[in-house]
């Protein structure tokens, strides 16, 4: 028994090391790739100082943090709602953040500062997450809870579409492209949003014990002495915060929070002591690679990263649904 535990521990360490190496390689590729390829040897030249340190580095850091936040949010929501299909985009949390941001643009007539828009996006995500938690407390089946989340997402999407369609504001019309997801406008001025993600990410990665209990189910977690009300509300707040900040930085990006935790679980990373940091590393790597594809796929324009993740993630999502139905 002890030998099996040690083997599992060594395997977990190997997975985390491999994911760390993958993330570092994706980070280097993101800094080098672009309209002009700049190798690491040229990073400290005047050209490298402009393109790498002033343009690509803040974007790369934002992609890394958002990818980690979305993947961890997916893992947390799947444990919290006891639903393997739960993730911020599918359950409408990302769209809720978008509604909050668009409401801020409308009410502020485009005059609100970026920090106020970010806070409104966070508030919108929190409201939708709290509504979902309210549904969860009514002991709905997992399929009904999933449908409730999808319905909330559709309502939020309809509200955003109506607002953009009837708006005469140039800023609001530009949000239509922004809501497809993209890091094109990220620079060092958004560093406060990046910093707002770091403490929550680190804190959640340290909460493996309550997450493992939640993954066992509500009854088992209560029998083990876990204060469910406290942890549900704290994790809801943390997840809403991460999703809101991510939407404020880059718009709505789907499938990262759904696919990454599933893939890692299929690889044997079921313990949240390994799953949570693994999701952070794998989510960051996946979004960094998707961002490189978004930048390089077209010569004269940049693809919205939400389109790239949806194109790559939708087939995986369908495969997971078929696999779960067997």
Swiss-Prot record:
Entry's Gene Ontology BP terms: cobalamin transport
Cellular location(s): Cell inner membrane
Membrane topology listed for this record: Multi-pass membrane protein
Assembly description: The complex is composed of two ATP-binding proteins (BtuD), two transmembrane proteins (BtuC) and a solute-binding protein (BtuF).
Keywords, in A-Z order: Cell inner membrane, Cell membrane, Membrane, Transmembrane, Transmembrane helix, Transport
Keyword Transport: yes
Residue stretches spanning the membrane: 15-35, 61-81, 88-108, 112-132, 146-166, 184-204, 240-260, 274-294, 302-322
Protein name as catalogued: Vitamin B12 import system permease protein BtuC
Pfam families attached to this UniProt entry: FecCD
The organism's place on the tree of life at top rank: Bacteria
Family note: Belongs to the binding-protein-dependent transport system permease family. FecCD subfamily.
InterPro entries for the chain: ABC_BtuC-like, ABC_transptr_BtuC, ABC_transptr_permease_BtuC
Listed GO MF terms: vitamin transmembrane transporter activity
Disulfide bridge positions per record: none
GO cellular component assignments: plasma membrane
UniProt keyword Transmembrane helix, yes or no: yes
Function: Part of the ABC transporter complex BtuCDF involved in vitamin B12 import. Involved in the translocation of the substrate across the membrane.
């Amino acid at each position: 028994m002890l030998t099996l535990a040690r083997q599992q521990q060594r395997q977990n360490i190997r997975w985390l090391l491999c994911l760390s190496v993958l993330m570092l390689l994706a980070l280097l590729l993101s800094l080098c790739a672009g309209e002009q390829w700049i190798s690491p040897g040229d990073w400290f030249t005047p050209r490298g100082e402009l393109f790498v340190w002033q343009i690509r580095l803040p974007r790369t850091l934002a992609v890394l943090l958002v990818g980690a936040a979305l993947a961890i949010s997916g893992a947390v929501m799947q444990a919290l709602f006891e639903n393997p299909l739960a993730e911020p985009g599918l359950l409408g949390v990302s769209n809720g953040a978008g509604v909050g941001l668009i409401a801020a643009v409308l009410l502020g007539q485009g005059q609100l500062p970026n920090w106020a828009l970010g806070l409104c996006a966070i508030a919108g995500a929190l409201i939708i997450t709290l509504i979902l938690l309210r549904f969860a407390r009514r002991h709905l089946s997992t399929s009904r809870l999933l449908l409730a989340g999808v319905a909330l997402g559709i309502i939020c999407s309809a509200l955003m579409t109506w607002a953009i369609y009837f708006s005469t504001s140039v800023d609001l019309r530009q949000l239509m492209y922004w809501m497809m997801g993209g890091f094109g406008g990220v620079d060092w001025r958004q560093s406060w949003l990046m910093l707002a993600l770091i403490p929550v990410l680190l804190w959640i990665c340290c909460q493996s014990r309550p997450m493992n209990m939640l993954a066992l189910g509500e009854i088992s977690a209560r029998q083990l002495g876990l204060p469910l009300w406290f942890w549900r509300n704290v994790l809801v707040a943390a997840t809403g915060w991460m999703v809101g900040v991510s939407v404020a930085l880059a718009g709505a990006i789907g499938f990262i929070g759904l696919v990454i935790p599933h893939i890692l679980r299929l690889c044997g990373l079921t313990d949240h002591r390994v799953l949570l940091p693994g999701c952070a590393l794998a989510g960051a790597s996946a979004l960094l690679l998707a961002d490189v594809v978004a930048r390089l796929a077209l010569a004269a324009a940049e693809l919205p990263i939400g389109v790239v993740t949806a194109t790559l993630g939708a087939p995986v999502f369908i495969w997971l649904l078929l696999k779960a139905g067997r």
